[in-house]
Design a protein with these regions (language model features):
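Flexible loop/turn segments at secondary-structure boundaries
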Residues: 167-170, 194-196, 204-206, 235-239, ...
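A short, flexible helix-boundary coil/loop motif
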Residues: 288, 312-342
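Active-site- or DNA-interface-adjacent structural scaffold in DNA-acting proteins
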Residues: 1-165
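Flexible, glycine/threonine-enriched loop-and-boundary segments that flank and lead into catalytic domains
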Residues: 161-177
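Electropositive, glycine- and tryptophan-enriched low-complexity nucleic-acid-binding patches
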Residues: 174-221
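Short, conserved catalytic/metal-binding motifs centered on acidic residues
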Residues: 6-12, 42-52, 186, 193, ...
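Helix-centered, glycine/charged polyanion-binding patches within enzymatic domains
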Residues: 224-296, 300, 322
Length: 342
């Protein structure tokens, strides 16, 4: 018996680094085996979601202020003498941004933003000359230079200093116009709902391009290739992905029989079942905010959330079977105690 936390947080960090993405896939494979052969369904449903990173909403002024504050600390480590530390200047310039949407404060906010960018550029230029190429801080300096040089219309922009791989996605949500993180593709069984694959995309690709690596992961983890993948309209553009048939909503064939139409409707109704599964991954299994670093952290966090979801589903199924067995046992006991009249 020990009073205290089960382990230190750094131990989990070392564990994740040791197992990597391949080890996380093995953990997911073990949770799929809990469900037996019922998990290996011929038809699966596929959908994509956004795994948001633990970063603030990026703006030019926020990034410039972070560059100034981080650059001042880095200058102290490398013995670079700056003319000033900007400890009072940066908060004043950030305070000027509060009224940027008002008529009186718009010009003041633009002037403060230009001043912040000028200060950040000055600090980065001094660090660029002082920090050696082999230093660990060199990557930070290069990232800061890219942030200060990027424009509004540029592609592959950097939105975070500590997470430069983050990209912006707009899924058309009314309450959340832009999301910053990594796109995730999730595959689940059509009837059982067991998550068979969870693939994190390194770039913001079209949904159909994410299907092939996701199905390859299903083949590695679950040990089979699904015959049919049912997706939404985001997967349009291809009828087959390797040996797997891709089915998406559409007008259908003109000469389709009533049976084919009914089968298609049932398929697309079942496709919608993956939406609450993804919602539970976010609300119950920590997929709504990813605190792990880098693209490897994106992949591991997604796989661990899927691996935690499958045993939860299995335990609910076992509980339902137990309740069903107890009800049958109770009915038999009552019928034996009070037999029905002949």
């Amino acid at each position: 018996m020990q009073c205290g936390v089960p382990c230190d947080a750094s131990e989990l960090t070392h564990f994740r680094k040791r197992i990597g993405t391949a080890g996380a896939e093995k953990i997911l494979a073990a949770t799929i085996k809990l469900h037996g052969e019922r998990a290996k369904e011929k038809e699966v449903v596929v959908d994509t979601t956004v795994q948001e990173k633990n970063i603030t909403f990026p703006t030019d002024t926020k990034l410039a202020a972070k560059i100034v504050r981080g650059g001042v600390k880095m200058a102290g480590r490398h013995g670079v003498k700056l003319r000033q530390s900007f400890e009072r200047t940066v908060p004043k310039l950030l305070a000027a941004q509060r009224g940027r949407r008002t008529k009186a404060g718009a010009a003041r906010a633009r002037k403060a933003a230009r001043r912040l960018k000028t200060i950040a550029g000055r600090v980065v230029r001094q660090l660029d000359a002082a920090v050696p190429m082999e230093s660990r801080d060199r990557r930070w300096v290069e990232t800061a230079k890219k942030i200060l040089s990027q424009k509004r219309s540029d592609s592959r922009k950097i939105y975070s200093l500590h997470e430069p791989e983050v990209y912006c996605m707009s899924k058309g949500k009314e309450h959340k116009k832009y999301e910053f993180g990594a796109k995730a593709s999730v595959v689940a069984g059509k009837n059982g709902g067991v998550i068979l694959g969870a693939y994190s995309l390194p770039e913001n690709d079209y949904d159909g391009h994410a299907l092939e690596p996701t199905l390859e992961q299903v083949e590695r983890v679950a040990g089979y290739r699904p015959a049919v993948a049912i997706g939404d309209k985001g997967f349009r553009g291809q009828s087959h992905c390797g040996q797997t048939e891709v089915v998406t909503p559409g007008r259908g064939k003109k000469n389709a029989s009533a049976y084919e139409k009914r089968k298609a409707r049932k398929r697309f109704r079942r496709r919608a079942a993956i939406e609450p599964r993804i919602g539970h991954l976010k609300s119950d299994f920590r997929l709504d905010r990813n605190f792990l670093k880098g693209q490897v952290g994106d992949a591991i966090n997604l796989l661990m959330a899927a691996a935690a979801s499958n045993p939860s589903l299995w335990m609910r199924q076992v509980l339902l079977r137990l309740v069903w067995a107890l009800r049958i046992f109770q009915q038999k006991c009552q019928s034996a105690q009070y037999p029905l009249p002949a």
